[in-house]
Amino acid sequence: MPTGFQPAESFISFGQPASPPYKGNEASSSSRKGKRKASDTPAPGEKQTKKNKKDKKKKGSKKSQPVDEPDKKDGLPGLSKKQKKALKEQEHKARKSDRKRDNSRGIEAGPRNKKEEQKAAERHAPWTELVDVDLCRDPVDLLTEEINAFYKYVSPTREEFEVRLFMIELITRTINKLWPEAEVTPFGSWQTQLYLPQGDIDLVVAHKYLSDANKQRLLAELGKAMRQANITDVVAIIARARVPIIKFVTLEGKINVDISLNQANGVTAGKIINQYLDALPGARQLILIVKYFLSQRSMNEVYTGGLGSYSVICMVISFLQLHPKLRRSEINPELNLGTLLIEFFELFGRNFNYNDVGISIRRGGFYFSKASRGWMKGQSFLLSIEDPQDKDNDISGGSFGIRQVRNTLGGAYELLSMRLFERAEEMSRNARSGRRSTSWKDKEGDDWSILGGVMGITKETLKQRNELTRIHLEGRLHHKLSIPLGADPKPFVQNYRPPPIISVPSVTDHGRGASSPPPPAESSKRNKKDVGAIMVEDDELESDDDSDSDASSYSSSDSDDSDSDPVAISPRTANSRSTSRVPRADISDTESDGIIEISQPFESSGRGRKPLGDSEPSEDEIEVLSNPPEESRYAGGKGRGKAKVKDAFRPPTPPLPGQEGQLSDLSRPPTPPLPPGEEEEEIDSDEEALRRILAESDGDLGSEDEIGKEWQGAIQVDSDSDEEEKKGRKKRKRGVRSEERRAFWAAKGGNRLGQSSGDMSD
């Protein structure tokens, strides 16, 4: 099926790009601006200089013959070794410039050498064995199931987890033997449990006698201790870096290990990230996908210009925090991972404004202006991500290759979209022909996989995972640590943590909307173009009276943040009012200057609300004003999201006896209670409200003053008489409906269904 997408293989493919054609002496002469050395070969029709003749005599007849046939066919004379070398360098520069030009246009040039090309060809999608394709209703479900299957597949098994745990314990015992008072703490991907099969282990050593002056000497001692303990045979000491570390690869399992000294901020960052991950379902799956995607393209290291794990985690968290449908709790992220992954690639690969906008995940997440913080630094193309621990620190400022990363993410968006269209066409064709159950089973997973178009498992990864499993089964590390085989490692390990629990919902069991938080119920007659414009904080009414009891019951936990608690997280649930953007009052003046506001359809503050009747309210305003403060529009319930006309348009009414002084400034006066079974039902729309008012109202209503007198009298009727009580109830209901009808036409301008502004009576 022809699609509107360009072939995305040119963006992230692994095919070798064709080299540009050689332009001969034309490129050479243009690069030198018309100047040539005396030793150069003369152009056609130009006389040879004396120096060239002498050179020919010295070099003999051997050099006077043509060097190779292609040059002879092109009419070019023989070339010397020096000229050949110059031509090769020139061709290399031309290829390099073309590759740079392609990158600037959004085209990645594929593998950089034959080894990378071979690795790309060896990739396959073994996680597809965990996907039941026949139960997927559409390609989006298929992609979501693939993401969950990939997450399960790359997550560590019990054997792999314990090998890493025992390796950390072995290194810890070696360090404690060298420095008995030192404290070793793992952090990074081990702390968040977001490491890949070939991921490294980050450790920090804290000691009260460690200082910056003796760090280099202590790192050398630490490296020597690692070699003597047969943990590794080669240690690299990076002492002049901003964070001095030692790096080595373990002999058992070939695991990369980084050890730093007295860097406690890494441990704190891991604790903060774990809080975010617990509050954002689906974040772990997306983070592992993006990390693996960048890792296979050598774009996961900051020192090479790529994005580090910390930056990737913050990007995914920010994406989930600010996603409109997640802010309104309309979808379950874990059942819509396929859509979210494509939208993530689209945002940071096509639409994100890297030049002007920075990312912050603090206080619910927001975007800010880079210029307001002085983060332009002459390189506006760099990605800026605020450190959750320090708002003045840019954790992604060192990723100088972000433009190539952006092009790669954009290519992934194009390729995944194209594969979705292909699978949709194939599913539709199979459904029409009745071959659904057999068509997919006859194919290999690599053939129908959507996610396999942008990533895959290499043989090198499989080999290392098998090696870790073999080490565990043979008990090599058990023997070194004196741990019995099959025993629970908790009593024998200092930095013990339980293995991760891998549990993800399946769209084949629930469907995308079954177990998701129920979306707000919308009226069928509501203006559809307004849906989706309301943010979570739209229906939060601000109170002038700080003593309002209702205000504390629905205020966002993010808005209660103080400067002493820079990271406050409230898990987003269907019944909670966690906001994705903190109000300006909770952000300092210096911080709020650069915050980019998210456009709202109207001002939701109670202070700026216009009185009823001044202008025709919008559909959204009607809904916000109609909801009482103690009830959330997003809370589960039958009538959630419906406009209660009796609350939206009713003017203040006299309180019942005994209820004086019980009304707050923000709450509307309650109506007289009706007997059981006669409660008013919620109205879906304005037309429904008007139709009911006109249908149930009597035609003998008097003036407004008369109604008020009769109503006051009806309240004071003696309850001993049933007949008088019924009569008073009827009068009270007529008065209420008359008030409703008057307020309704006052709000609407009184010009609908033949009514005029002056014709408000019956």
Curated annotation (Swiss-Prot):
Biological process per Gene Ontology, one example term: polyadenylation-dependent ncRNA catabolic process
GO CC annotation, single: TRAMP complex
Domain PAP-associated: 336-393
Polar residues: compositionally biased ranges: 572-581, 753-762
MF annotations from Gene Ontology: ATP binding; metal ion binding; poly(A) RNA polymerase activity
Subcellular location: Nucleus, Nucleolus
Region span, Disordered: 1-123, 482-762
Gene3D superfamilies: 1.10.1410.10, Beta Polymerase, domain 2
Enzyme Commission number(s) of this protein: 2.7.7.19
UniProt xrefs under Pfam families: MTPAP-like_central (PF22600), PAP_assoc (PF03828)
Annotated Basic and acidic residues bias: 65-75, 99-123
Stretches that traverse the bilayer: none
Cofactor dependence: Mg(2+); Mn(2+)
Protein residues bound to Mg(2+): 200, 202
Subcellular location, principal: nucleus
Disruption phenotype: Increases the level of AFR1 RNA in the cell, a main efflux pump of azole drugs. Decreases growth on very low carbohydrate medium and on sodium dodecyl sulfate (SDS). Sensitive to flucytosine (5-FC), a precursor to 5-fluorouracil (5-FU). Resistance to fluconazole (FCZ), ketoconazole (KCZ) and itraconazole (ICZ). Cell wall integrity appears normal. Normal growth on rich medium, in presence of amphotericin B (forms membrane pores) and Congo Red (perturbs the arangement of the cell wall).
Segments of skewed composition (Basic residues): 50-62
Catalytic activity: RNA(n) + ATP = RNA(n)-3'-adenine ribonucleotide + diphosphate
Compositionally biased residues, Acidic residues: 536-549, 677-687, 697-707
Domain of life: Eukaryota
Role according to the record: Required for 3' polyadenylation of the 5.8S and 25S rRNAs as a prelude to their degradation in the exosome. Involved in the nucleolar organization to ensure faithful chromosome segregation during mitosis.
UniProt similarity note: Belongs to the DNA polymerase type-B-like family.
Binding partners and assembly: Component of the TRAMP complex.
Protein name: Poly(A) RNA polymerase CID14
